[in-house]
C-alpha cells in the first residue's frame, strides 16, 4: 500500500470536524463520497439528530444472505468532549504532529481506524474489483453518547430487509502497547441500577420518631459490595459490581433524611443473564431493607466471538504485519459490538464480531494521540482480513 499520506490526511480531515457526540459534523459525508467513488451504494438511517451511514459493495446483501460471505466494517464518527482546550498542548480539533504522534480528539478513538478502513478497502477493491461476496460499512455518530439512535437503530432497519453480515470488524482502539497486540473478541455486559430506600424524615434529636434510610441502607449496600458473583470463565474475568453514587440528606446536620438513592453498575460475563442479576441484587437488598424500589437499565448483554474464521483471519493478518501473536480479550468497556453480535435479537442471527484498532492509552484523555507509523500497518491488516474472508 502506498496510501500512508492519504490515510494521514483523511485522519486529519476527520479530526478537524468537531463531531462531539451525537454530532457528525460532515464526517460521514466525506466518507460517503469516498465510498461511492469506489462503487459502494450508500444510504443514511438518520434519526433524532443522529447520523448513520450504511454502505455496501458486491452482492446485494438483501438477496445474498447465506450464499456468499459478507464482511462489515463498523465504527463511529462521534467523539467525547475535549474538556478545556487550554489543558491541551495543541488545540484538540486542530490535528498536530509532534514526535511521530498525531494529536487531536478522536485520533485514537476512532478516526484513525476509520481512515485506515477506507484505504484498506480502497486497496482491496483496486486489486479485486469483482470480489466475491459483500463488503459493507456501518458508521454512526451515536456511540459515545446514549447509543440509542445509532448502530442499534440502523441494525433494526437492516434486519427488517433481511440483511445480516457474517463477520464484523469494529475499529475500536483495542491495542494496549503495540499495534495489534490485543483484539477484543467480546465484551462484558453492563447493567445499571438505581435503588431508592425510604425512611421517615425528622429531627436527629428524636430517634424514636424517625427511620434513617442511611442507617438502613448501609448493611444492604455493604452486602452488595461484598457479594462474589462468579469466578469468571475461560473468556471473561469475574463479574464486578460498583456503587457509583449515593444521594441522601438535606445538607442540614440536624435533619434525618427521608430517603436514600444509590446508583450502581455491574459488568457481567456470560455466566449470568441480566434478569438473573436483577433478581439476585433485589434479593440481597431486601434481606436488609423492606421498603426499597428499583429502576434498571441494561446497556447491553455480554457478547463473545469464539475461535473461528474471523478470529483466525484477524490473528493471521496481525501476525503477517507485526509478527505479534494477538491476545484475544474481553476486557474493557462496552461498545457497539453489543448490538452487532446478536443482530436482530432473535438469538438465531449471531454475527462474528471483533474489535481491532489503534493503541488505546490516550483515549478520552487530554492530548489524545495515535502513532503516525501505525496508520499504514493498520490499513494493511484490515485489507488482509478482507482478502482472507472474501477471496476464497
Describe each region flagged by the PLM:
Residues 304-318:
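Short, low-order "capping/linker" segments at domain edges
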Residues 92-104, 198-199, 319-323, 360-361:
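Glycine/charged-rich beta-loop-alpha catalytic/anionic-binding loops adjacent to active sites
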Residues 43, 322-392:
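Zn-dependent metallopeptidase/amidohydrolase metal-coordination segment
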Residues 1-105, 125-132:
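Acidic/His- and Gly-rich active-site-bordering loop/insert found
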Amino acid at each position: 500500500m502506498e496510501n500512508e499520506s492519504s490515510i494521514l490526511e483523511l485522519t486529519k480531515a476527520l479530526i478537524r470536524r468537531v463531531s462531539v457526540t451525537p454530532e457528525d459534523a460532515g464526517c460521514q459525508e466525506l466518507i460517503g463520497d469516498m465510498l461511492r467513488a469506489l462503487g459502494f451504494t450508500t444510504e443514511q438511517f438518520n434519526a433524532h439528530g443522529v447520523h448513520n451511514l450504511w454502505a455496501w459493495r458486491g452482492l446485494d446483501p438483501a438477496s445474498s444472505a447465506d450464499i456468499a460471505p459478507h464482511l462489515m466494517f463498523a465504527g463511529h464518527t462521534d467523539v467525547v468532549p475535549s474538556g478545556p482546550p487550554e489543558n491541551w498542548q495543541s488545540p484538540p480539533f486542530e490535528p498536530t504532529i509532534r514526535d511521530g504522534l498525531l494529536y487531536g480528539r478522536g485520533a485514537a478513538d476512532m478516526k484513525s481506524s476509520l481512515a485506515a478502513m477506507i484505504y484498506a478497502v480502497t486497496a482491496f477493491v483496486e486489486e479485486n474489483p469483482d470480489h466475491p461476496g459483500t463488503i459493507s460499512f456501518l458508521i454512526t455518530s451515536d456511540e459515545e453518547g446514549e447509543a440509542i439512535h445509532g448502530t442499534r437503530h440502523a441494525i433494526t432497519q437492516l434486519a427488517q430487509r433481511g440483511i445480516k453480515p457474517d463477520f464484523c470488524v469494529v475499529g475500536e482502539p483495542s491495542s494496549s502497547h503495540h499495534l495489534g497486540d490485543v483484539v477484543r473478541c467480546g465484551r462484558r455486559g453492563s447493567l445499571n441500577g438505581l435503588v431508592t430506600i425510604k425512611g421517615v424524615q425528622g429531627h436527629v434529636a428524636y430517634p424514636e420518631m424517625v427511620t434513617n434510610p442511611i442507617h438502613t441502607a448501609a448493611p444492604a449496600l455493604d452486602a452488595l459490595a461484598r457479594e462474589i458473583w462468579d469466578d469468571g470463565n475461560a473468556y471473561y474475568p469475574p463479574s464486578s459490581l460498583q456503587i457509583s453514587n449515593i444521594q441522601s440528606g438535606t445538607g442540614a446536620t440536624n435533619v434525618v433524611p427521608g430517603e436514600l438513592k444509590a446508583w450502581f453498575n455491574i459488568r457481567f460475563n456470560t455466566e449470568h443473564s441480566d434478569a438473573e442479576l436483577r433478581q439476585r441484587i433485589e434479593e440481597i437488598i431486601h434481606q436488609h431493607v423492606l421498603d426499597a424500589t428499583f429502576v434498571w437499565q441494561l446497556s447491553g448483554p455480554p457478547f463473545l466471538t469464539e475461535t473461528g474464521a474471523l478470529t483466525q483471519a484477524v490473528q493471521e493478518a496481525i501476525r503477517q504485519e507485526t509478527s505479534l501473536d494477538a491476545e484475544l480479550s474481553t476486557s474493557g468497556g462496552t461498545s457497539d459490538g453489543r448490538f452487532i453480535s446478536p443482530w436482530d435479537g432473535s438469538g438465531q442471527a449471531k454475527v462474528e464480531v471483533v474489535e481491532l484498532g489503534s493503541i488505546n492509552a490516550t483515549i478520552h484523555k487530554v492530548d489524545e494521540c495515535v502513532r503516525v507509523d501505525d496508520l499504514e500497518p493498520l490499513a494493511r491488516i484490515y485489507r488482509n482480513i478482507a482478502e482472507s474472508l472474501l477471496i476464497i
